[in-house]
Swiss-Prot record:
Was identified as a high-confidence drug target. Belongs to the glutamate synthase family. One of its GO terms (biological process) is L-glutamate biosynthetic process. This is Glutamate synthase [NADPH] large chain. Its cofactor is [3Fe-4S] cluster; FAD; FMN. FMN binds at residues 1083-1135. GO terms for molecular function: 3 iron, 4 sulfur cluster binding; glutamate synthase (NADPH) activity; glutamate synthase activity; metal ion binding. Binds 1 [3Fe-4S] cluster. Coiled coil: none annotated. Residues 18-416 form the Glutamine amidotransferase type-2 domain. The active site is at residue 18. NCBIfam families: PRK11750.1. It is an enzyme of class 1 (oxidoreductase).
């Protein structure tokens, strides 16, 4: 049974992902063969599922088939009516036979009430002998019901009502919900068309468990199968897929908001299609509370489909393609999407969504193309779609088409018509169903076409008074607002945050500060809002919705907002809306209502609560009175009336109207004085606002212009710049959570509350939780009152001269916010470690640890309970020399910091036997060998981040640990960045990039879009270095514990929990402050969740984030960590003085700079760093002795040794309840250790490479060439990588001569074929390949070509040969692919050469080197972020310019050198693959070469020109490059 919410564990945070496949006979011919093939496909996807602590209890597997009428007639002892005239479904019932019988009787009563007859029940034959104890203990009773009384869609609708009533009335509940009747009745399906068998099973167990699936009489014309990978191990049979209509590979990121909006829409649904008009109420709530994201998607899809739409129509409403910026889209299709956007927001997130109603079967891919889906069609009408190629052994001679599902595209098989229906036909037919464009023209009201409103200017002293009342500081205006107005972009900062979270601050804080942005990590990816802007949208509408099931021309009667930030005059348009005002010659008919959000400040929290009730009541009254837009305004605050915090007002009204089920009848707009940062705007939208007018920030910008604070720009441009920066910032916040459209983000409330009471959250931010509790309305009112007093002084004559407070959030200021690192602590730390004086070090730690006055961190609220165990003598405690081996330095890249600083840390850690982390910038190979004096500059931990800078086979081989950086504490959900002025030639060489050209790491790893993708990369890295531990770095947030459980199940050796306050070399300032959570919360949740899952003893837990003292380490140990990372502190020890200018390359002490002159100022030494870590270890020993522990392992997870009494001394923090942080869970796995005591099974002994290594032994030992052939299947993953590791170990980075090891494979290569393969290895596949071919290619050669047995008329250049994300992070080598490949080909390629015959969207993204030849079409957004290398595209039809992202590249014609190189390369491709298109081009070279277009990055071209000029003039090339880089 799934545990209920306990401690910090919350079942609502569970995630899953999976493998999915469908097998269908296009002509609708039922056969046993289809069922067998579907089950075989499922077995070949087993590696995409998972098991937990008990291997025989799987995460879930299932199959959906057509109702097997002939089989069922023989299986039951009662007569069945004609096919299609009865429905059936397997019911999951209580285990007790008495309760099961009662449930059956209740279902029968409901069915009869709905006009259906229960024909009978059947006991479903099962065999549970293969199940593990967890699955068996949670196993329900299985009964199959048969219903009659209608046919066709009428039967489907009645069954739907019966099932929904059974769920609502008989107590089906979601995971972890309390109360009797949990999962009393659950129907995987109840239909006359389809039947689902599923459960908490492994893929091999499905057929073994359900004996029906072994019966040869059971037939179908289609089968959809699914293998589940969950982040937990708690069995829940209903959570397995398929669901009633769908099977899903991916995750819906916006599901909370989608469910809230669906709940609000229910009141508008008026239909008699399910019986009488009153019957529709029986269906509500449509979404089962607590159900999985996929289950809720399926429930809404059912409603839309059974409510009258075709299944394809319903799917496209929920997962529309990216139409907003698609300029070449057919206008009718665009109108279809725009119209439906007014009915429903997208269900956004990675999705390969397979669907069926039993006749049509199809799939759709999300707009970003984030899940793999491959399709095969055979000559006898068999159609297969799966997450991978090779799930079925189809003879190549029978396969006539090989396709892929493309972003936003739909694939559909209609078995009634016996054909594949094209995406174009589906959408053209749907677009023609109604006059959508006409409805839009008559209904939508563009904002800029409304009558103009007035904009009032305020004098300076009134603006200052308002700024004080709303908590503005000088720092905010100068560091945040002014740069946004000047530059149109968020300002950048560095070094992370070391100030208290809002609930611990002694200062009044904005309510926004108590909400931290959530972000995607592992279970779904963040999106790239910069390079993939083409699939994003900030456009929205406001003005209310209509009945979802009865659309007409009135359904889109709304105002169109191009983005959510309204200028003052634009808000005035909405305020003064007159229904009789005409737009396009017609009265628009829309009304607005302004509601004042103020309260009498003298009445405190009680007055605030009363005012909120008044505001909510006024909103409800306004809706009843016909208002379609409500404007929540705090503009008229004065001496007596204080503003209600805008976030509280918006969220409070939003949730009140959701509960009233009137929310969708009105749009919410905020006229806000307190919103000025990007985070503020994002929070307001995230909690329900359609638009924001931050009037005071506009007035502040105008005031700064008037006073000359902002210069060189006029008023209009400054305001436009601010709006542009804010909009881009909101888009980035959305993209952190993997959301593409503002409509999906609105109301999704993707935030974590830190330090807010459950009472406030339940009432005003419903759905959010904060296990520790926190501030109440009284405290919020106290913060407002403190600001209000500053604005309205007792003497009115003083008010005009009042100045803003300094701030001090981002930079230390004497009168500002408290910083853990301040001049005094920096001095003490450096003095103690440079002089080796432990006594002075203790003075430093006392300053940091002394929380009696400054409770600056959550750990500051904790104290040690020294009486729990008797103390032990210090000499009996584990020595410092052993403890220090648990320490590592945080990941700091070479490039962000200087070589001197980087190597100082490495030398010190290697001397101690500890570990340094090289960060994401690669490492100079010269450091891999020891220095003559015995020192070692090699970093023990090599990081693998999203850009894969410098990640080669040689790099991966030279380490003890490999760390996958999923997120960074200072900026989770974002990529890294290294400005061009810091990319000196020596940095570029290590990163395999171009000197002087700025580098940006993509926000996602493009090979990790889900938990099973992470498992694949862990497997890749373990193959690349079998002796290295593989780490996964996560950032603390709600739910990180369940992600960590998934990481453990994915076989990582170490999971790192980073705090939100980690350091960075460069990040937007708002990210630094408002994303992620304290590590104390994430670490405690991780420990508790791993224990509950029985996974704690198989994985090491590490923590980092502003660790500064032995006390910090001891508290982290007691909360569950056994290893510890330090970054800022050792950097300070090495000389950093916290100037926070790392991103500018101006570090005055030579730490965070590449400037040779500044680097000369570096004074750090390894000995200083050694002293620091030994001092920390000694302090830890002292604490261990006091607490009665002899070793660190004894102390790990012993949270009972901590107490929370210190929290009572803080005016806000005394309301925190830290008991959940210290909770010690009871687990079903009681024998497990609280620390890692066993090893993960990586399954390397089963790898195909073990055979390849044996067969290649002569080459590995002596360099003698070997050549051989073998077969390969999709289950053979990461082939060639371990072989490459052995070659690299023997021969280093130079490898062997090309082709020394030459292997030919026949079949379908599994994921990551040829990953990191070094020079000397050639791999050929006759067949096809999956995703990630040539990932990190390090000099090897890969050829993929169709099988020689392919049909004679097979046109390779029209068919798929490889998957997505091919050549990701390749640094050298060659790849030749005869055919078309998927999305993101050559992403981050930095040196490899490749030829391919067509690519999907986002080709050559972030490419920094190498050359790519494309002998076919490209998808959209080609060359986005491409800063180096060259692409040659064969473009006879002139389509490339329309698909090109021209921000960083330009198109050129070939010169003579280009033509010669291209001819030779195509010839090599033809020789390797027998390419027909290549041969056609070569045979008419003089005529065809003019059709090639050269794609050239501008910065790369500029650097090449600088090099050429320098060489011509005989000047220093490096200086010339950097001169060009610096402008």
């Amino acid at each position: 049974m799934t545990p209920k919410r306990v401690g910090l564990y919350n079942p609502a945070f569970e995630h899953d992902s999976c493998g999915v496949a469908m097998v269908v006979d296009m002509h609708g011919r039922r056969s046993r063969d289809i069922v067998d093939k579907a089950i075989t496909a499922l077995l070949n996807l087993e590696h995409r599922g998972a098991q937990g602590a008990e291997p025989r209890s799987g995460d879930g597997a299932g199959i959906l088939i057509q109702v097997p009428d002939e089989f069922l007639r023989e299986a039951v002892d009662f007569e069945l009516p004609a096919p299609g005239s009865y429905a059936t479904g397997i019911a999951f019932l209580p285990q007790s036979s008495k309760d099961a019988a009662a449930a059956c009787a209740a279902v029968q009563k409901i069915a009869e009430a709905e006009g259906l007859q229960v024909l009978g029940w059947r006991s479903v034959p099962t065999d549970d002998s293969s199940l593990g104890a967890l699955s068996r203990d949670a196993m329900p009773t299985f009964r199959q019901v048969f219903l009659a009384g209608a046919s066709g869609m009428a039967l489907e609708r009645r069954c739907y009502v019966v099932r929904k009533r059974a769920e609502h009335e008989l107590g089906t509940k979601g995971p972890g919900q309390d109360g009797p009747g949990r999962e009393t009745v659950y129907f995987p399906s109840l239909s006359g068309q389809t039947l689902v068998y599923k459960g908490m099973l492994t893929t091999p167990q499905l057929k073994a468990f359900y004996l029906d699936l072994q019966d040869e009489r059971l037939t179908s014309a289609l089968g959809i199968v699914h293998s589940r990978f969950s982040t937990n191990t708690f069995p829940s049979w209903p959570l397995a897929h398929p669901f009633r209509r769908i099977a899903h590979n991916g995750e819906i990121n916006t599901v909370t908001g989608n469910e809230n909006w669906m709940r609000a829409r229910e009141a508008l649904i008026k239909t008699d299609i399910f019986g009488s008009a009153a019957d529709v109420e029986k269906l509500f709530p449509i979404c089962t509370p607590g159900a999985s994201d996929t289950a809720r998607f399926d429930e809404v899809l059912e409603l839309l489909h059974l409510g009258g739409r075709s299944l394809a129509h319903a799917v496209l409403m929920m997962i529309p393609e990216a139409w907003e910026r698609h300029e070449s889209m057919d206008p009718a299709r665009r109108a279809f999407y725009q119209y439906h956007a007014s009915l429903m927001e997208p269900w956004d997130g990675p999705a390969s969504m397979t669907f069926t109603d039993g006749t049509v079967v199809g799939a759709v891919l999300d707009r970003n193309g984030l899940r793999p889906s491959r399709i095969w069609v055979t000559d006898d009408g068999l159609v297969v779609m799966a997450s991978e190629a090779g799930v079925l052994d189809l003879h190549p001679s029978t396969v006539v088409r090989r396709m892929r599902l493309q972003p936003g595209r739909m694939f559909l098989v209609d078995t009634a018509q016996g054909r594949i229906v094209s995406d174009e036909e589906i959408k053209a037919d749907l677009a023609a169903e109604h006059p959508y464009q006409e409805w839009l023209d008559n209904g939508l009201v563009p904002l800029d076409e409304l009558p103009e409103g007035k904009d009032v200017r305020m004098p300076h002293h009134r603006i200052v008074m308002r700024q004080l009342a709303f908590g503005y500081t000088y720092e905010e205006l100068n560091l945040l607002v002014a740069p946004m107005a000047r530059l149109g972009a968020e300002p950048i900062g560095s070094m992370g945050t070391d100030t208290p979270v809002a609930v611990l601050s002694q200062r009044p804080r904005m309510l926004y500060d108590y909400f931290h942005q959530l972000f995607a990590q592992v279970t779904n990816p963040p999106l790239d809002a910069i390079r993939e802007e083409v699939v994003t949208s900030l456009q929205g509408t406001t003005g209310g919705e209509r009945d979802l099931l009865n659309p007409d021309q009135n359904s889109c009667h709304q105002i169109v907002l191009p983005q959510p930030i309204l200028r003052n005059h634009e808000l005035a348009k909405l305020v003064s809306l007159d229904p009789n005002d005409k737009v396009n010659g017609r009265p628009h008919g829309l009304r607005s209502k302004v509601i004042r959000c103020l309260y009498r400040v003298s009445e405190g929290g009680a007055g605030l609560a009363a005012a909120l009730e008044e505001v909510r009541g006024a909103a409800a009254a306004a809706i009843a009175d016909g208002a379609r837009i409500i404007i929540l305004s705090d503009r008229e605050s004065d001496e007596e009336m204080a503003p209600i915090p805008s976030l509280l007002a918006v969220a409070g009204v939003h949730h009140h109207l959701v509960r009233e089920r009137t929310r969708t009848q009105v749009g919410l707009v905020v006229e806000s004085g307190d919103a000025r940062e990007v985070h503020h705007m994002a929070a307001l939208v995230g909690f329900g606002a359609a638009a924001i007018n931050p009037y005071l920030v506009f007035e502040s910008i105008e005031d700064m212009l008037d006073r000359g604070v902002i210069e060189g720009i006029d008023r209009t441009a400054a305001l436009n710049n601010y709006i542009k920066a804010a909009g881009k910032g909101v888009l980035k916040v959305m993209s952190k959570m993997g959301i593409s459209t503002l409509a999906s983000y609105t109301g999704a409330q993707l935030f974590q509350a830190v330090g807010i009471s459950e009472q406030v959250l339940d009432e005003y931010f419903t759905g959010l939780t904060c296990p520790t509790g926190g501030i109440t309305l009284d405290d919020i009112a106290a913060d407002v009152a403190a600001r209000h007093r500053l604005a309205y002084l007792d003497r009115p004559d003083e008010r005009a001269h009042r100045e803003l407070e300094v701030g001090g959030e981002y930079q230390w200021r004497r009168e500002g916010e408290y910083h853990l690192f301040n001049p005094e602590t920096v001095f003490k730390l450096q003095h103690s470690t440079r002089t080796g004086q432990y006594k002075i070090f203790k003075e430093y730690t006392r300053l940091v640890d002394d929380q009696s006055e400054r409770m600056a961190s959550l750990r500051g609220l904790l104290k040690f309970r020294t009486g729990v165990r008797p103390p032990v003598p210090l000499d009996e405690v584990e020595p410092a020399s052993e403890i220090v081996k648990r320490f590592s330095t945080g990941a700091m890249s070479y490039g962000s910091i200087s070589a001197e600083a980087h190597e100082t840390l490495a030398i010190a850690m290697n001397r101690l036997g500890a570990r340094s982390n090289c960060g994401e910038g690669g490492e100079d190979v010269k450091r891999f060998d020891r220095d003559p004096n015995g020192d070692w500059r090699r970093s023990a931990i090599k990081q693998v981040a999203s850009a894969r800078f410098g990640v080669t086979s040689h790099y991966l081989t030279n380490c003890t640990d490999l760390q996958i950086k999923m997120a960074q504490g200072a900026k989770p959900g974002e990529g890294g960045q290294l400005p061009g002025h810091k990319v000196y030639p020596w940095v570029a060489e290590v990163r395999h990039s171009t000197p002087g050209v700025g580098l940006i790491s993509p926000p996602p790893h493009h090979d990790i879009y889900s938990i099973e993708d992470l498992a694949q990369l862990i497997h890749d890295l373990k193959n690349a270095n079998p002796s290295a531990r593989v780490h996964v770095k996560l950032v603390s947030e709600n739910g990180v514990g369940t992600v960590a459980a998934g990481v453990s199940k994915a076989h990582a050796d170490v999971v790192l929990i980073s705090g939100h306050d980690g350091g960075t070399g460069a990040t937007p300032l708002t990210s630094m402050k408002h994303a992620g959570a304290p590590w104390e919360l994430g670490l405690a949740e991780t420990q508790q969740t791993l224990l509950l899952n029985g996974l704690r003893d198989r994985i090491v837990v590490q923590v980092d984030g502003q660790l500064k003292t032995g006390r910090d380490v001891m508290i982290a140990t007691l909360l569950g960590a056994e290893e510890f990372g330090f970054a800022t502190a050792p950097l300070v020890v090495a000389g950093c003085i916290m100037m926070r200018v790392c991103h500018l390359d101006t570090c005055p002490v030579g730490v965070a700079t590449q400037n040779p002159l500044l680097r000369e100022r570096f004074t750090g030494k390894p000995e200083f760093v050694e002293n620091f870590f030994m001092f920390i270890a000694e302090e830890v020993r002292e604490y261990l002795a006091q607490l009665g522990f002899r070793t660190v392992n004894e102390a790990v997870g012993q949270a009972g040794a901590l107490d929370t009494t210190l929290a009572r001394a803080h005016w806000k923090a005394h309301k925190l309840d830290l008991a959940p942080v210290l909770h010690e869970p009871e687990s079903a796995f009681m024998n497990q250790d609280l620390y890692c005591s066993s090893r993960q099974d990586h399954g390397l002994d089963k790898a195909l490479d073990q055979q390849l290594i044996v067969m290649s032994r002569e080459a590995l030992d002596s360099g003698k060439p070997v050549r051989f052939s073998t077969t390969i299947g999709n289950v053979n993953r990461t082939v060639g990588t371990m072989l490459g590791h052995e070659l690299t170990k023997a021969y280093g980075g130079q490898g062997l001569p090309d082709g020394t090891i030459d292997i030919t494979f026949d079949g379908s290569a599994g994921n990551s074929f040829g990953a990191f393969v070094p020079k000397g290895i050639t791999l050929r596949v006759y067949g096809d390949a999956n995703d990630y071919v040539g990932k990190g290619l390090s000099g090897g050669r890969i050829v993929v070509r169709p099988s020689d047995d392919a049909p004679q008329d097979y046109v390779a250049e029209d068919n798929i040969i490889g998957g997505n994300v091919i050549l990701f992070g390749a640094t050298s080598g060659e790849v030749y692919l005869r055919g078309v490949v998927g999305e993101r080909f050559a992403v981050r390629n930095s040196g490899a050469h490749a030829v391919v015959e067509g690519v999907g969207d986002h080709g050559c993204e972030y490419m920094t080197g190498g050359r790519v030849v494309i002998l076919g079409r490209t998808g959209r957004n080609f060359a986005a972020g491409m800063s180096g290398g060259v692409a040659y595209v064969y473009d006879p039809d002139g389509e490339l310019p329309a698909n090109l992202n021209s921000e960083m590249v330009e198109l050129e014609t070939l010169d003579e050198d280009d033509a010669d190189w291209l001819h030779g390369t195509i010839q090599v491709h033809v020789d390797a693959t027998d390419s027909a298109v290549g041969q056609r081009i070569l045979s008419d070279w003089s005529g065809q070469q003019r059709h090639f277009v050269k794609v050239m990055p501008r910065d790369y071209k500029r650097v090449l020109q600088a090099i050429a000029l320098a060489e011509r003039d005989g000047v220093d090339v490096d200086k010339a490059i950097m001169a060009a880089a610096h402008g």
